[in-house]
Amino acid sequence: MIGFTPPSGIYTHIAGIDLVRTSEKEFFVLEDNVRTPSGVSYMIENRETMYNMFPELFSKIKVRSVTEYPAKLLKALKASSPQLLNDSTVAVLTPGMYNSAYFEHSFLADQMGVELVESQDLQIIDGRVAMRTTQGFKIIDVLYRRVDDMFLDPLSFNENSALGVPGIMDVYKSGTITIANAPGTGIADDKACLLYT
Protein backbone atom coordinates (compact mmCIF):
# COMPACT_ATOMS: atom_id res chain seq x y z
CA MET A 1 0.00 0.00 0.00
CA ILE A 2 1.48 3.27 -1.11
CA GLY A 3 2.00 5.94 1.54
CA PHE A 4 1.22 3.64 4.46
CA THR A 5 3.50 2.00 7.00
CA PRO A 6 1.91 -0.80 9.02
CA PRO A 7 2.03 -0.86 12.83
CA SER A 8 5.58 -1.51 14.08
CA GLY A 9 6.78 -1.07 10.48
CA ILE A 10 6.52 -4.81 9.88
CA TYR A 11 5.17 -6.01 6.53
CA THR A 12 6.16 -9.67 6.64
CA HIS A 13 5.71 -11.50 9.94
CA ILE A 14 5.75 -15.04 8.55
CA ALA A 15 7.57 -16.36 5.49
CA GLY A 16 7.52 -19.80 3.94
CA ILE A 17 10.71 -20.23 1.95
CA ASP A 18 10.83 -23.25 -0.34
CA LEU A 19 14.34 -24.68 -0.62
CA VAL A 20 15.80 -27.17 -3.03
CA ARG A 21 18.91 -29.14 -2.15
CA THR A 22 21.36 -29.41 -5.04
CA SER A 23 24.18 -31.16 -3.20
CA GLU A 24 25.16 -32.20 0.29
CA LYS A 25 26.20 -28.66 1.21
CA GLU A 26 24.23 -26.52 -1.22
CA PHE A 27 20.68 -25.23 -1.07
CA PHE A 28 18.85 -22.79 -3.31
CA VAL A 29 15.71 -20.79 -2.67
CA LEU A 30 13.06 -22.10 -5.02
CA GLU A 31 10.45 -19.51 -4.08
CA ASP A 32 9.30 -17.13 -1.38
CA ASN A 33 5.82 -17.46 0.08
CA VAL A 34 4.80 -14.41 2.08
CA ARG A 35 1.21 -13.71 1.02
CA THR A 36 -0.33 -16.42 3.21
CA PRO A 37 2.40 -19.03 3.72
CA SER A 38 1.13 -22.48 4.52
CA GLY A 39 2.47 -25.88 5.50
CA VAL A 40 4.15 -25.42 8.88
CA SER A 41 1.54 -27.45 10.77
CA TYR A 42 2.16 -30.46 8.55
CA MET A 43 5.89 -30.16 9.20
CA ILE A 44 5.32 -30.02 12.97
CA GLU A 45 2.97 -33.02 12.93
CA ASN A 46 5.28 -34.98 10.61
CA ARG A 47 8.29 -34.25 12.81
CA GLU A 48 6.42 -35.41 15.93
CA THR A 49 5.31 -38.63 14.24
CA MET A 50 8.81 -39.34 12.94
CA TYR A 51 10.32 -38.65 16.36
CA ASN A 52 7.88 -41.04 18.04
CA MET A 53 8.67 -43.76 15.50
CA PHE A 54 12.44 -43.24 15.18
CA PRO A 55 13.75 -41.38 18.27
CA GLU A 56 17.26 -42.80 17.84
CA LEU A 57 17.48 -41.37 14.33
CA PHE A 58 16.75 -37.87 15.58
CA SER A 59 19.37 -37.99 18.32
CA LYS A 60 21.93 -39.57 15.99
CA ILE A 61 21.75 -36.93 13.27
CA LYS A 62 20.95 -34.00 15.60
CA VAL A 63 17.67 -32.88 14.06
CA ARG A 64 16.52 -29.61 15.58
CA SER A 65 13.18 -29.50 17.33
CA VAL A 66 10.31 -27.50 15.81
CA THR A 67 7.92 -27.91 18.73
CA GLU A 68 8.48 -24.32 19.87
CA TYR A 69 7.26 -22.85 16.57
CA PRO A 70 3.70 -22.00 17.75
CA ALA A 71 4.99 -20.29 20.92
CA LYS A 72 7.57 -18.33 18.94
CA LEU A 73 4.95 -17.38 16.34
CA LEU A 74 2.64 -16.09 19.08
CA LYS A 75 5.50 -14.11 20.64
CA ALA A 76 6.34 -12.54 17.26
CA LEU A 77 2.70 -11.67 16.58
CA LYS A 78 2.24 -10.10 20.02
CA ALA A 79 5.46 -8.12 19.56
CA SER A 80 3.93 -6.51 16.47
CA SER A 81 0.82 -5.28 18.28
CA PRO A 82 0.15 -1.57 17.73
CA GLN A 83 -0.44 -1.17 21.48
CA LEU A 84 2.74 -3.10 22.41
CA LEU A 85 0.98 -4.74 25.34
CA ASN A 86 2.00 -8.04 26.91
CA ASP A 87 -1.63 -9.13 26.94
CA SER A 88 -2.40 -8.24 23.31
CA THR A 89 -5.25 -10.25 21.84
CA VAL A 90 -4.30 -12.32 18.79
CA ALA A 91 -6.73 -14.21 16.55
CA VAL A 92 -6.35 -16.34 13.41
CA LEU A 93 -8.72 -15.39 10.57
CA THR A 94 -9.69 -18.38 8.43
CA PRO A 95 -11.86 -18.53 5.30
CA GLY A 96 -13.55 -21.51 6.96
CA MET A 97 -13.63 -25.27 7.13
CA TYR A 98 -13.83 -25.75 3.36
CA ASN A 99 -10.44 -24.12 2.80
CA SER A 100 -7.68 -26.61 1.92
CA ALA A 101 -5.46 -25.28 4.73
CA TYR A 102 -8.17 -25.22 7.42
CA PHE A 103 -6.39 -27.94 9.39
CA GLU A 104 -3.38 -25.67 9.67
CA HIS A 105 -5.48 -22.65 10.67
CA SER A 106 -7.17 -24.56 13.49
CA PHE A 107 -3.93 -26.32 14.50
CA LEU A 108 -1.97 -23.08 14.84
CA ALA A 109 -4.78 -21.28 16.69
CA ASP A 110 -5.05 -24.20 19.10
CA GLN A 111 -1.28 -24.50 19.62
CA MET A 112 -0.94 -20.75 20.23
CA GLY A 113 -3.97 -20.69 22.52
CA VAL A 114 -5.77 -18.01 20.49
CA GLU A 115 -9.19 -17.81 18.87
CA LEU A 116 -9.84 -19.11 15.37
CA VAL A 117 -12.32 -16.71 13.76
CA GLU A 118 -14.23 -16.35 10.52
CA SER A 119 -15.48 -13.08 9.07
CA GLN A 120 -18.94 -13.45 10.63
CA ASP A 121 -17.26 -13.57 14.07
CA LEU A 122 -15.75 -10.11 13.57
CA GLN A 123 -17.19 -6.62 13.65
CA ILE A 124 -15.85 -3.08 13.55
CA ILE A 125 -16.73 -1.29 16.80
CA ASP A 126 -15.57 2.28 17.47
CA GLY A 127 -12.76 2.01 14.94
CA ARG A 128 -11.43 -1.30 16.29
CA VAL A 129 -11.80 -4.90 15.14
CA ALA A 130 -13.68 -6.98 17.69
CA MET A 131 -14.61 -10.66 17.85
CA ARG A 132 -17.76 -12.15 19.28
CA THR A 133 -17.27 -14.17 22.44
CA THR A 134 -19.68 -15.70 24.94
CA GLN A 135 -19.00 -12.66 27.16
CA GLY A 136 -19.62 -10.11 24.39
CA PHE A 137 -17.22 -8.47 21.97
CA LYS A 138 -13.46 -8.50 22.58
CA ILE A 139 -11.02 -6.18 20.80
CA ILE A 140 -8.36 -7.83 18.62
CA ASP A 141 -4.89 -6.27 18.46
CA VAL A 142 -3.26 -8.67 15.98
CA LEU A 143 -5.03 -10.62 13.26
CA TYR A 144 -3.07 -13.47 11.68
CA ARG A 145 -4.99 -13.64 8.45
CA ARG A 146 -5.21 -16.72 6.29
CA VAL A 147 -7.53 -14.98 3.82
CA ASP A 148 -6.12 -13.68 0.53
CA ASP A 149 -5.93 -9.90 0.01
CA MET A 150 -8.74 -9.77 -2.55
CA PHE A 151 -11.21 -11.25 -0.08
CA LEU A 152 -10.04 -9.46 3.09
CA ASP A 153 -12.35 -6.43 2.89
CA PRO A 154 -15.37 -6.26 0.55
CA LEU A 155 -15.37 -2.46 0.85
CA SER A 156 -11.77 -2.18 -0.41
CA PHE A 157 -11.31 -5.17 -2.69
CA ASN A 158 -13.74 -7.80 -4.00
CA GLU A 159 -17.19 -6.47 -3.13
CA ASN A 160 -18.69 -9.96 -3.36
CA SER A 161 -16.39 -11.42 -0.71
CA ALA A 162 -18.08 -13.15 2.20
CA LEU A 163 -14.69 -14.15 3.65
CA GLY A 164 -13.55 -10.71 4.76
CA VAL A 165 -14.57 -8.02 7.20
CA PRO A 166 -16.20 -4.87 5.79
CA GLY A 167 -14.11 -1.85 6.82
CA ILE A 168 -11.10 -3.74 8.17
CA MET A 169 -8.74 -1.92 5.80
CA ASP A 170 -9.82 1.47 7.22
CA VAL A 171 -9.15 0.17 10.73
CA TYR A 172 -5.79 -1.18 9.57
CA LYS A 173 -4.84 2.17 8.03
CA SER A 174 -5.76 3.91 11.30
CA GLY A 175 -3.07 1.83 13.02
CA THR A 176 -5.22 0.14 15.67
CA ILE A 177 -4.70 -3.41 14.42
CA THR A 178 -1.81 -5.39 13.00
CA ILE A 179 -2.65 -7.67 10.10
CA ALA A 180 -0.06 -10.39 9.56
CA ASN A 181 1.15 -10.56 6.86
CA ALA A 182 0.42 -7.04 5.68
CA PRO A 183 -1.94 -6.80 2.70
CA GLY A 184 0.14 -6.41 -0.45
CA THR A 185 3.11 -8.48 0.72
CA GLY A 186 2.18 -11.12 -1.84
CA ILE A 187 4.01 -9.06 -4.44
CA ALA A 188 7.18 -10.67 -3.06
CA ASP A 189 5.80 -14.07 -4.13
CA ASP A 190 6.00 -12.97 -7.77
CA LYS A 191 8.90 -14.66 -9.56
CA ALA A 192 9.76 -11.36 -11.28
CA CYS A 193 10.81 -9.99 -7.85
CA LEU A 194 13.51 -12.66 -7.54
CA LEU A 195 15.68 -10.52 -9.81
CA TYR A 196 15.92 -7.96 -7.00
CA THR A 197 16.84 -10.27 -4.11
Locate the predicted segments by residue.
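ATP-dependent carboxylate activation and anion-phosphoryl transfer catalytic cores
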Residues: 1-166, 170-178
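Class I SAM-binding transferase module
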Residues: 177-188
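P-loop NTPase catalytic cores that bind/hydrolyze ATP
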Residues: 191-192
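Conserved small/polar residues in nucleotide/adenosyl-binding loops
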Residues: 196-197
